[in-house]
């Protein structure tokens, strides 16, 4: 039950963060495409004359810090639990959990510094390209930690889930690196937000496939260490059942990718409608000044006379 609750929390946090970043990215590129540049953090809009709203501008960043704190504490606490159901038993589980906790602590340090630099005038805010570079390193470390976690699992399903999660983290790392070098690359910014949403959906699917009996693939069962009373994730004893379960997970991952693409289309449409953008037919560009306007009209008249 604890594993499923944590997966639900991680899924909700990542989906909220990714969707918020996606909405802000679309809004800024639609409203001011010429001055658009990717930002690691978008504060809530400022409302003139509303002090309470202005104080809540950093609410998304505060929620991110709280989520990272919970993730860091969770990985730290479970490192003290025994887990004989992984390769290498409890010592390997302990170091693997501490490795994940260290990655979350890195993200937490960056988020806390960003909050303090936005609030206190004594701290100089870090440039956006440096923040994206740090995020790229953090996502790469998470990719490394997830890959190492997949390697020590005796559960083939959990190993495959961790492997797919690692690939999403590797994609996020690459996109952050691109944004550090090309901050005006809108496609990379939108893809980064979509990848975070995909990671959130995959965390939910991982929890359902490993810890909820109704979603466990056919022919698989929960692991249990009877002597230690330790429950693990899902294991398939028969090779045919394992291959079928892995194929089901691959299919579900593709379904989640399709859902994220649909979410991207819907979000862009709704943001464009909220920003007042409407689809129009073809038009001829208007001249910029009055002299160009008179020349434009004269050319039109001359063309009509010649015809």
What is the role of each PLM region?
Residues 1-5, 37-59, 84-99, 149-163, ...:
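Juxtamembrane membrane-interface segments at transmembrane-helix boundaries in membrane proteins
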Residues 8-22, 61-74, 97-113, 129-148, ...:
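Hydrophobic alpha-helical cores of multi-pass transmembrane domains in eukaryotic membrane proteins
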Residues 10, 32-118:
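Eukaryotic helix-linker segments that join adjacent hydrophobic helices
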Residues 19-33, 211, 261-284:
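Transmembrane-helix exit/juxtamembrane "anchor" motif
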Residues 19-36, 76-84, 208-218:
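Juxtamembrane interfacial secondary-structure elements that flank transmembrane helices
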Residues 20, 27, 115-117, 178-183, ...:
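Structural signal for the C-terminal ends of transmembrane alpha-helices
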Residues 36-48, 224-235, 278-307:
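Non-transmembrane, juxtamembrane loop and terminal tail segments
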Residues 125-128, 132-135, 145, 157-234, ...:
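Eukaryotic polytopic
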């Amino acid at each position: 039950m604890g594993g499923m609750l944590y997966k639900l929390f991680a899924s909700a946090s990542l989906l909220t963060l990714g969707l918020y970043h996606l909405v802000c990215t679309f809004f800024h590129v639609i409203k001011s495409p010429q001055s658009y540049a990717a930002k690691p953090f978008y504060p809530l809009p400022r409302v003139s004359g509303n002090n309470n709203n202005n104080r809540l501008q950093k609410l998304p960043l505060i929620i991110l810090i709280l989520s990272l704190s919970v993730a860091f504490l969770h990985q730290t606490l479970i490192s003290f639990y025994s887990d004989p159901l992984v390769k290498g038993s409890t010592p390997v589980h302990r170091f693997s959990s501490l490795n994940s906790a260290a990655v979350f602590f890195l993200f937490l340090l960056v988020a806390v510094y960003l909050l303090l630099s936005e609030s206190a005038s004594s701290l100089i805010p870090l440039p956006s390209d440096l923040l994206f570079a740090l995020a790229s390193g953090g996502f790469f470390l998470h990719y490394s930690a997830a890959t190492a976690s997949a390697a020590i699992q005796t559960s083939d399903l959990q190993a495959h889930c961790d492997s797919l999660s690692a690939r999403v983290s590797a994609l996020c790392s690459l996109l952050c690196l691109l944004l550090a070098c090309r901050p005006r690359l809108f496609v990379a910014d939108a893809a980064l937000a979509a990848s975070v949403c995909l990671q959130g959906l995959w965390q939910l699917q991982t929890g359902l496939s490993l810890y909820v009996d109704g979603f466990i693939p056919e022919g698989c069962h929960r692991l249990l260490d009877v002597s230690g009373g330790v429950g693990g994730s899902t294991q398939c004893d028969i090779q045919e059942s394992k291959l079928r379960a892995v194929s089901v997970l691959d299919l579900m991952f593709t379904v989640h990718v399709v859902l994220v693409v649909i979410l991207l289309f819907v979000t862009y449409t709704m943001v464009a409608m909220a920003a007042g953008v409407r689809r129009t037919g073809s038009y001829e560009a208007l001249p910029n000044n009055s002299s160009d306007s008179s020349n434009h009209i004269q050319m039109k008249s001359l063309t009509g006379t010649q015809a």
